[in-house]
Amino acid sequence: MKFTRYCRSLLSTPAMAVERYTKSHQSGADIAMVDLEDSVPPARKEEARRLAEEFFALPSTKLARSAVRINTLSGPDGLRDLIAIARYRVKPDLVLIPMAESPRDIEIAAGALGADCPETEFLAVVETPLGIEHAPAIAAAGHRLRGLVFGSADYTFAVGARLSWEALAHARARVVNSARGAGVEAMDAPFFEVTDLAGLRREAGLARDFGFSGKIAVHPRQLALINETFSPDEELLERARRVVAAGLETGRSVTVVDGVMVGMPFFEASQRLIEQFDPARPDVPPQPHVPSQPGVPSQPRGSHHPQGDSPTDIPTMTEK
């Protein structure tokens, strides 16, 4: 399983709901997003762009990232959104590109933002049959593309499927495999039943076990459960501590921990897990990355990510 604090959860706030901006930043979501797309009626798009600028000027928690979902780039509003964003005083950390169907969508967004937003990165929302088919190419669209987001509602309507986990399992698996193959993150679609926390727990657990990094929330009450599901429990953290301790003791040579053979990839993944989720362990010193030997997985693309952003892959006790 992969764990990261980069995108366990995302909470969307309509651009017109200015009174909710502050709460969004303080919600506990890893990504606080203002929405210019579905939640804004066509007649108020320009007003929404003006209001959304204030979303990025508000104080946020040190771990939260700010994001904006633009309109689809197949119409004029998407480009208008990007032109407006490029002029914002404070730039967003992330731009979500909806209805992504080819790498060209990411290229257009990067070109429109230009030199005005050099640090802004992208998440591509894959939510059409063509987007699912082209997901591998979209995921590899460039170093500013940080992940794929599965959009279940639009995809379901497009193919005529049921909005259920079983019916959409193939599409979800393709999104995850495409993202992981390119070394980027994968976020699952929302669970739309706001009051059904048991259903959310089940679906979030399935998404985690599928390989997703996190899940979109449609209501703040979903965030705590989503963050918990996509974070390691104490048992996994304790195992990571034992793996790191064994690596320090053996000089990071191959050894056995809890009956499982572990080597360099295990040491590095356990180290990252502790650095991200167990900050009370200052006694575990950061270790430099050592290039892997042939046949041994190395750090994926995304090793340029800031400290604490890269995913952490920890095998379970039963894995060999």
Language-model region placement:
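Expand to "…catalyze enediolate/carbanion chemistry for C-C bond making/breaking, isomerization
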Residues: 1-289, 293, 299-320
